[in-house]
Amino acid sequence: MTESNNGVLVVVEMLDSQPIDLGLEMLGLARRLADSSGGTVTAVAFGTGLETTGELLSAYGADQVLINDHEIFASFHAEAWLPDLSKIMVGVAPALVLIGHSFSGTDLALRLAYRLVVDVATGCESIDIVNGRPPMTRSCFGGLAREV
């Protein structure tokens, strides 16, 4: 994580106006990473009927919650989410972004990385902060080895 911004942004996927478990787990990880580096956690949610989502995401560790509640976000469409998420990324300027390794999360992460010309690591199993940098570990070779 950079010295200028130690923030972690988490894109929380929603299902039937409720955050999926993976999103809540990533908020816990983000909270741990932010606490170890003196940063903050920003949660972003897209969907409809998200009136109480902010309180829930704050309870799971978000310092700031950005809700995008509109009919266009009722189901996942990367083309619909990407412009708003790109603007959020530029405005928040996090050091690290966590997006779940789901079908929609992977689709969104790759498109976002391409649009913003940033690195992306998919399928990560662990991440920590070591000397101000976030080494990530993921499986390779069918789970027979790990790469960092």
Q: What feature does the model see in each segment?
A:
Residues M1-V148:
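N-terminal glycine-rich FAD/FM-binding segment characteristic of electron-transfer flavoproteins
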